[in-house]
Amino acid sequence: MSKEKSLVVDNIQSLEELISSVKEAQRIFSTYSQEQVDKIFTAAALAANKARIPLAKMAVKETGMGIVEDKVIKNHYAAEYIYNAYRDTKTCGVIEEDKAYGIKKIAEPIGVVAAVIPTTNPTSTAIFKTLISLKTRNGIIISPHPRAKESTIAAAKVVLEAAVAAGAPDGIIGWVDVPSLELTNTLMKEADIILATGGPGMVKAAYSSGKPALGVGAGNTPAIIDSTADVILAVNSIIHSKTFDNGMICASEQSVIVDSSVYKQVKEEFTKRGCHFLNKTELDKVRKTIIINGSLNAKIVGQSAYNIGKLSGIEVPETTKILIGEVTSVDLSEEFAHEKLSPVLAMYKAKDFDDAISKAERLIADGGFGHTSSIYINSATENYKLAKFEEAMKTCRILINTPSSQGGIGDLYNFKLAPSLTLGCGSWGGNSVSENVGVKHLINIKTVAERRENMLWFRAPEKVYFKKGCLPVALNEVKTVLGKKKAFIVTDQFLYKNGYTKCVTDKLDELGITHTTFFNVAPDPTLECAIEGTKAINSFEPDCIIAIGGGSAMDAAKIMWVMYEHPEVDFMDMAMRFMDIRKRIYTFPKMGEKAYFIAIPTSSGTGSEVTPFAVITDEKTGIKYPLADYELLPKMAIIDADMCMDQPKGLTAASGIDALTHALEAYASIMATDYTDGLALKAMKNIFEYLPAAYENGPHDAKAREQMATASTMAGMAFANAFLGVCHSMAHKLGAYHHIPHGIANALLITDVMRFNAAEVPAKMGTFSQYAYPHCKERYVECANFLGIAGKNDDEKFENFLKAIEELKDKVGIKKTIKDYGVDEKDFLATLDEMVENAFDDQCTGANPRYPLMSEIKAMYLKAYYGKEVNPEDIKTK
């Protein structure tokens, strides 16, 4: 016997001493290895198993309840089945590790467990709780029921002595020698966790103690016997369960609800197997005995049917197994509708399955929410009924064709149901757990998460064809490789009327491909336009869609493509923002099932031919919605400089700076990669070198046109994978509210945004695992170096880079401010706050290296309007 347990715990002072000593023992125990713990666990389980018979005898003698032979089984179960379930479970140190994902889970003990033990199962519950506490390196102090204190303490002593002999710290298990409500409440308040098994009052006290508690709820298990049930199996299973230890397991059946079609057969089988059906007089006598003043009569708990008969003043054979009362009411005014914890059973006749479920629901609601329910049924043929039963029962254990006493505690009739003598009842039963309590509930798990970088990607159309004059060669594949027969062309009126589509339609005619053209796409295409185009597509039923034009035509065509292939989609769902394109709530439908999508650009800026994006405007609200999903990627992109030769100067300038902004934002993005960086840098170099010539010489400089077409597509590929930033967010809203062309809007904002991003002490930086610290200025300097822009240091190089961009804008005729483009000051200021909020919420904002505050977006808008820093407070006073 340990030195500490020479202490007799019978008052608060001695309890405090015990708690202190167990805490010290647990502190030492918490340093033990898994190997040491498993040795102790094994020794304790062996000792408990060896003592199963004397402990059972002691429990029955002390409490006057139950059956020795059945308590032997319970003790055996508590030792052997609990040991077997957790013998290989890791409960110490690192219990799980995934080096690839950088996750490690470490188990730590909780501390000291306060274990409240019931009078119904004193020794087996003590064995169970001490064993799972030892397995988890916790100390445990047992508060026994006053009627079962000697046997409970004896069980704890057996486990303690074996554990200490195997190396456990002295005094790792303790107990209250003279239990009282005051001592139990004090123990619960000072322990680290409570394992409460007992009546509703005790469980409620545990949950009110202010400490984490694992308790059970009341059980009032109903068992339905369906018309399809194996009656012999059902009746004998219920008898086996209800008579086990005279019905003292809380999961035991309290009522049986029998379908009327088999009621007679069930009654005959119960009678044949030694059960007694009470007549009316006997029924009334037993009613008065089992429930007194609305509560269970403690004198009947764990008694035999014969002894309960004697208490009730009725005579039944001594061999009677169960007293069965045939009753009709499931209301609590009916004594037989209560939990009885004895071989007394209510029996109801159900007119049909729905009636049976209704009765079971009421019995559970009034006395057993969360605990256990049972059904006997042909599970192979009655799936519908089973599903209905499972849905209706608010219990955490639903047993099928199983004796509920043995089935509910687990690992006897189903080997995936964890063995336990503390059965959680979930929130329905006022519990914190809804499963059978085990070792996992007595450990704290520390999750160690190492920083990991996201898997990145590079996505592009499956076919990208480029070179001046490549269009007719690439289009051959539409017939020879793809086998397409009908092509629907989407373009705008200007391109259609000026013959830009003729080279495509002539080639389609040559290939024998039927075609039609929709040319009502306007700049900033609207939903109305997309719907109109979709009607034409539905009428034509093409197997190929060809978008010819700038971003507007390609964006409109992408939306039409989606509506054609998936008319069921909700546009607002598609436009929903996401933080990570792979984790978005809305999943885009699979595209390309009906039609193959080909994009042919006629301007050098948007890059839409190689991006998964489309911008569409709601004509009713004026709001622009940027859609993004890789399902929107064209299947084929054809970049033929011949299609871009005749761009007017204004379009050349706007689209050229748009492409530059794509490259700059892709390079600065928190999602930039080596794969996108090269494309972005080469695009920038092409634009700085060839945009002025393309602007000045137009169709007379084929090389400049081709290099700009290449730059646009490379920048498109870069931002298709690295995404954009707040410059585009702001430009989208500037275009929507004040109708400034998109490329011009970007041009007016880009250098202010770059200066904003380059701050080394930003208010907030972007969130992405790869983005380690604010280093956007370094990134911009890398661009400057690649472009050959010099400077004495990084700061000077950055400033010179900004100057070079401004000079490039000057060369292509772009004005300095928003105001210069005729936007009325009053109108601008009236819409400013709304633009700011919508820009902040734009899909592009999330990838910006500096996460913008709305006040910062507002300041950038004001600077872009006035061409100088402006105090927002001064604006308010205007």
Walk through the language-model features, giving the residues of each:
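Gly/Pro-rich interdomain helix-loop hinge
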Residues: 737, 743-827, 870
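Glycine/threonine-rich beta-strand-loop-alpha-helix active-site module
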Residues: 90, 155, 528-642
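N-terminal Rossmann-like NAD(P)+-binding subdomain of aldehyde/semialdehyde dehydrogenases
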Residues: 2-104, 132, 272
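Rossmann-like NAD(P) dinucleotide-binding subdomain of oxidoreductase/dehydrogenase enzymes
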Residues: 94-233
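Carboxylate- and glycine-rich phosphate/diphosphate-binding segment that chelates Mg2+/Mn2+
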Residues: 264, 272, 610-722
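ATP/NTP phosphate-donor binding region
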Residues: 455-544, 818-819
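Conserved C-terminal structural/oligomerization subdomain of aldehyde/semialdehyde dehydrogenase
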Residues: 3, 30, 314-315, 319-454
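ALDH superfamily catalytic-core signature
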Residues: 9-11, 203-331, 358
